[in-house]
Every structure is written in structure tokens, then in C-alpha cells.
Design a protein with these regions (language model features):
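Beta-propeller folds
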Residues: 5-342, 346-350, 358-359, 367-369
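Serine-hydrolase catalytic core recognition
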Residues: 152, 214, 350-653
Length: 653
């Protein structure tokens, strides 16, 4: 029985059944040609984030914030910058204590190899920054990362008169990783001390939090194998570890992503995140290590913790309890875990709490609403409509966006897809169809927001007469631990099986031309694109793979070893998932696109695949963006997506 205050049967649900059946039967009504005629056409300058008109073609955004408990628009009153300001520049830490004061340099030996105050462990484990200000703002903790033992990847800067070497420290799977220590700087005494972590070789430290009284530091430690994690407490004054609050083991992997959150009315208790019951949930813990209760439970995941309402003694969260494609806001009673829905039960919601947690800015969208803002009283549950963004695409020939579900390759699990149809769609015609894929962990492509979360490039392609199909396979996020971990030690294999279930579904639709199937993806999606092109060479006619992983032994330590173990521990898995041996199977037209200075999926991947194709006598196409990283910045993104589009226009249409 659900503990949610509002009965689930009465909650608005995603309207999936009808459209799913329509998709299976191909029962899409033909577009009204007269309605489409005379409508304006999109360009990539309208749709792409690097386009000149992208902002005016996006739903209107309000910059709202709370000044204590008063709602303020940043266009009227800018949010003031808090002090002290602590930041990292040129790998050193700087401190500015007041407006107009001279910044003080706190560290002096920062370099490419020794970095202070920056995100470590390659931004894994939820690490987004490297400086952590105390509650009193009298001290801050910071990371120090030593990369001197890490192998360099030789990136080259070709922008000058003579090209120069600008290497990246890049720890590949199974190789030496960097070492991280944690410092504490006291602003008042201007002194630095260090946590006594011992030998930090092959240890990861994440989710740093100050205790409510600033006397202790809480952090999670993860071993190199990423099978064990502990929540440890360090005394700030001595730097010594004083206790371990919690331990967790998983035979596949653990992945702490969130710091603990102390109750503002009782600093002896805090909330911890864990997937130990199979889904991401919240647990109420005491500072002496006792688990008081599991606050949330069920076959759904908690997505965010926004803060607390002191008046109702509740924690405010978002979760996908109503439907896997939704994100809704709840107040959860600390005393008993009882959940109360705070929004309209539809779509995807994000919240910003007032200082005391009694009011909430609820920003949301649904498949039919571009963006909206409600103000919610978390105590009385009264919702007030604040703003509705007009449709920025009014007057344009807009495609049809549909959502449905199919079964995964296991025959049991529901997988959700989005389909995008041309504005002038005619069910009696046959359309070239492109499968857009990502497929990897920590991402999803389908959700119940505007146009079912469609990417703007899909709109552009549909306008040109293509059907687009996007499926979230097993291994993607927000569906629970088993759903994600099915890919462990053999990345890409179950994902391909699920994507081919999607292809089988497409082949049942009378308007999909099975002889003109294409596939496109970037990063993990680039890996999936080449995997599908070479494992199913008679299915896909054209593919465009951006920034593709080719062999996981060339990918970085933290991510690669979490999902694949090391090449020494899992030689069969690395051999099975490498695309080098698949180069000989390439039959269709494949374009590979990379940034020449990609620090995430280094160019070695694509270059080695090209070499394998040369040896095998197969003929992929290749395009490189000089000086660009894993994604193309600014207006170069418009050029990129025009190039991707043209490749399908040349060889699929």
C-alpha cells in the first residue's frame, strides 16, 4: 500500500495507453495539408542552442528567487553575491572577503598536475565543485588533486603559428589514477590543515558536508573497485577520522551521488541517500550511526532533495512515483515518511524553496505546456498560478510528438519511446526513419515534459520528411538499480538488444520504410550507433556517430571501471564490447565526427577505429572539428547539426 497522502488512483497519470496503441497500429491521422501550408519553417538558427534565434524560439524563462520568504524576479532585483567568495583560478584557490576587497591567493603551487579547489575524480560520484564553505562561512574545505602519476594524453593545439602540445592527464581503465586529499582553510586564522586520510592511493572521496556546528566533516569514501562505500566523519580540529556512520556493499557497484542533509531543527539527525533496496530512496540517520527509518520506499526513485519545511517538519523532494517519465514534488513527513503531493500531478517539475520552506516556486512543463510557474504553499497546499509561457512555436509547421511503450528484450520490462512525425504526415506514405540513441547510464531521452522532451534536431529532421524514434533502453537512468545494472561488465550488449526491439516495432508500422533506417547518437550514443551499424549491418543503411567510444580500455578510470571492471579483471567483456573487431562488418554509410581535442572520449578511439576499417577494407567517412572538445561550442553546433542532417539527406532520403 502506498504511503502517499493522496491516493494514487486519483492522481493524474501520463496518458500513454491510447497513444501506445495508436503507434502499434499505425493509426496516426494524416495532417491537414491546408493547415500545414503557409506555416513558417524552422531553421537550425531557430532550433539549435548555438543558433542566432534560439533564445527567442525557446519558452520564456523567469528568473525567480526568494529573498528570505519574499518572491523576487531577478530582472527587477538581482540576487546579491554572497561573501566570502572562494574560487579556483589557474589551479589555485583565491578568497575575497568583501565587496571591493583584494582577492587573497590561498594556495601557491597549483599547476596542471597539482590542482586546488576543482572538481576531482573526473566529475564522477556527483562531484561538481571542489570548494565547500562551512555553515558559519568562517572556514572552507577543498580538494587537492595530484595528477603527477597519471599518464598524459597528447592533445595538440593547432591554432597558433606552430602547433603546441597541451596534454590532458587521462587515467584510462586499469591504469594509475590521481590522488586526492582534503584541506581545511580557516579564514579567521588564515591557516590550512588537512584531513588525516592516510594513503589515498586508489580511494575516492565525495559528497563533502559540514556538520551543523562546523566541528566535523562528513564524506563518502569509495574503493577503487567501487563495490564498497562508507560514510565517514572527520574532526575538523584534529583532522582525524572519529567514526564511520554507515557502510554499503554491492557485488556490482555502489555510487554515492548526494551529500547528507542535516535536519535544520535537529542537528543530531540527517538524511542519507541509498539504492540499497533497489531504488534511490532517503533514509533518516542519527549522527551516532543509527538508521532511524527509511523515509521513502517503493518502486520509484527520489530525484532531488530541495530542502526542508521547519513548520511541518518535512523534507521537500521530487520523485517519479506517479510515472517513470514524470518528476513531481512532495513533502515527506520526517516523523513517519508520509508523502503529500505538492503539484498538479502532471509533467516534470523543478522547485525552489523559500528560506523557511513554507513556499515553493514550482517550474514545470507537460507534453502540451512549454513552461509554467506556480507558487505553492507547502503548509496549506494552496497552489497559485504565476506565469504560463506562450508557445514560442506558434505559426510554425510543428511535427507531431507521441509517446508509447514496448517490451524490452527480456520480454517483461516496459521501455518508453518518443516518436516524432513530419508536420504533413500521411500514414499512407513510407518515410525514412532515424533512430536517435544515447543508451548509457545517468541519462534518459523520454520524459513527460514539452513535446515529450524532444531534441530540437528531431523537429528539424521531421520537417524535412523523416520519422524519428527515440527509445530509453535498459541501462538508462531513473528506473531502479536492476534496470541500470543489467549492463554490468558488458556495456552495449543489452542496450543493443533493446534498441533492436524498437526496430522490430518500427517494422510493424506501415509508414516506416524498413529499407531506409538510419541511426545517430553522440558519446555513448556514438558507441551505440557504430555498435548497431556493425552488429546489424543489413538493418541500418546510414549512421552518424559523434564522439564515439570504441574500446572501453581507452576510457577513463572511474566511469569505465564502475561498469566494466578493469581490462585485467574482465578481459572477455572488454573484447566483446570493443568495436575494433566489428570494423570489418561495416556495410552502410557511416560518418564519424569528433572534436579534435576531446578530453572525455579522446580522439584515439575514432582514429583506432579508422585504422581498423583501413585494415578491413571498409569505408567510413570522418569529420573533425579543430580545437573542439566533446561537444561543439557556440555556433559550431549549428554547423555540426547541418552536417549531420545533410548526411542523412544525401544517403538515406
Amino acid at each position: 500500500m502506498s504511503e502517499t497522502a493522496m491516493a494514487q488512483d486519483n492522481m493524474p497519470m501520463v496518458e500513454k495507453t491510447v497513444c501506445a496503441e495508436e503507434c502499434r497500429a499505425g493509426n496516426f491521422a494524416a495532417a491537414d495539408d491546408d493547415a500545414v501550408a503557409g506555416k513558417k519553417q524552422f531553421t537550425l538558427e531557430d532550433l539549435n542552442f548555438g543558433g542566432k534565434r534560439y533564445r527567442e524560439m525557446s519558452p520564456k524563462t523567469l528568473r525567480l528567487w526568494w529573498k528570505e520568504n519574499t518572491l523576487v524576479n531577478a530582472d527587477t532585483l538581482a540576487k546579491p553575491k554572497g561573501y566570502p567568495q572562494v574560487y579556483s583560478r589557474d589551479h589555485n584557490i583565491f578568497l575575497q572577503t568583501a565587496v571591493g576587497s583584494e582577492p587573497q591567493q590561498i594556495t601557491a603551487d597549483g599547476s596542471r598536475q597539482i590542482q586546488y579547489g576543482e572538481a576531482v575524480h573526473r566529475n564522477e560520484f556527483g562531484i561538481m565543485n571542489g570548494i565547500f564553505l562551512s555553515n558559519s562561512k568562517q572556514s572552507f574545505a577543498f580538494y587537492r588533486m595530484d595528477q603527477s602519476m597519471v599518464t598524459d594524453y597528447p592533445q595538440v593545439n593547432t591554432s597558433g603559428r606552430v602547433a603546441t602540445l597541451e596534454p590532458d592527464a587521462y587515467p584510462m581503465a586499469g591504469m594509475k589514477s590521481h590522488k586526492v586529499t582534503i584541506g581545511i582553510y580557516n579564514i579567521t586564522t588564515q591557516t590550512t590543515s588537512w584531513l588525516d586520510l592516510g594513503d589515498v592511493t586508489d580511494r575516492y572521496f565525495t559528497n563533502i558536508t559540514w556538520s551543523a556546528d562546523d566541528k566535523e566533516i562528513y564524506l563518502f569514501e569509495v574503493n577503487r573497485d567501487q563495490t564498497d562505500m562508507s560514510l565517514d566523519v572527520y574532526d575538523v580540529a584534529s583532522g582525524k577520522k572519529v567514526r564511520t556512520i554507515y557502510r554499503e556493499h554491492d557485488d556490482k557497484y555502489v555510487e554515492p551521488l548526494h551529500p547528507v542533509s542535516f535536519l535544520p531543527w535537529d542537528s543530531s539527525k540527517f538524511i542519507m541517500w541509498s539504492q540499497k533496496d533497489g531504488y534511490t530512496h532517503l533514509y533518516l540517520m542519527s549522527t551516532d550511526g543509527k538508521m532511524i527509518r527509511q523515509l521513502t520506499k517503493g518502486e520509484f526513485v527520489v530525484l532531488d532533495l530541495l530542502g526542508f519545511c521547519k513548520k511541518t517538519k518535512s523534507v521537500i523532494i521530487s520523485s517519479n512515483e506517479i510515472h517513470p517519465l514524470q518528476s513531481n514534488l512532495y513533502a515527506v513527513k520526517i516523523q513517519n515518511g508520509r508523502r503529500t503531493l505538492l503539484d498538479n500531478g502532471k509533467g516534470v517539475h523543478y522547485g525552489i524553496l523559500s528560506d523557511d520552506g513554507t513556499h515553493l516556486i514550482d517550474t514545470y512543463s507537460t507534453p502540451d505546456i512549454p513552461r509554467a510557474y506556480d507558487i505553492t504553499n507547502t503548509v496549506t497546499l494552496k497552489r497559485t498560478e504565476h506565469f504560463r509561457s506562450p508557445d514560442p512555436w506558434q505559426g510554425y509547421a510543428v511535427p507531431t510528438y507521441k509517446m508509447g511503450s514496448i517490451k524490452a528484450a527480456d520480454g517483461v520490462t516496459d521501455l518508453y519511446y518518443r516518436m516524432v512525425l513530419p508536420p504533413d504526415f500521411d500514414a499512407q506514405k513510407k518515410y525514412p526513419t532515424v533512430v536517435y540513441v544515447y543508451g548509457g547510464p545517468h541519462a534518459h531521452n523520454v520524459q513527460a515534459s514539452w513535446h515529450w522532451y524532444s531534441r530540437s534536431w528531431e523537429t528539424y529532421m521531421a520537417q524535412k520528411g523523416y520519422v524519428l524514434f527515440i527509445l530509453d533502453n535498459r541501462g538508462s537512468e531513473n528506473r531502479g538499480k536492476d534496470f541500470e545494472q543489467v549492463t554490468f561488465r558488458h556495456l552495449g550488449q543489452e542496450e543493443m538488444r533493446d534498441q533492436m526491439c524498437g526496430v522490430d516495432f518500427l517494422k510493424t508500422l506501415p509508414y516506416v520504410d524498413a529499407e531506409r533506417l538510419g541511426v545517430h547518437g553522440w558519446s555513448y550514443g556514438g558507441y551505440m550507433t557504430i555498435s548497431l551499424m556493425t552488429n546489424y549491418p543489413d538493418v541500418f543503411k546510414v549512421g552518424v556517430a559523434g564522439g564515439p567510444v570504441i574500446d572501453w580500455k581507452w576510457y577513463e578510470v572511474m566511469y569505465g571501471e564502475r561498469y566494466m571492471d578493469t581490462p585485467e579483471q574482465n578481459p572477455e567483456g572488454y573484447a566483446q564490447t570493443s568495436l575494433l573487431r566489428q570494423a570489418k562488418n561495416l556495410k552502410g554509410k557511416l560518418q564519424i565526427i569528433i572534436g579534435m581535442n576531446d578530453p572525455t572520449v579522446v580522439p584515439q578511439h575514432a582514429l583506432q577505429f579508422l585504422d581498423a576499417c583501413i585494415e578491413a577494407g571498409t569505408q567510413p567517412d570522418f569529420f573533425v572539428y579543430p580545437g573542439q572538445g566533446h561537444n561543439m561550442a557556440g555556433h559550431k553546433s549549428v554547423h555540426l547539426h547541418e552536417r549531420i542532417t545533410q548526411y542523412f539527406e544525401d544517403y538515406l532520403k
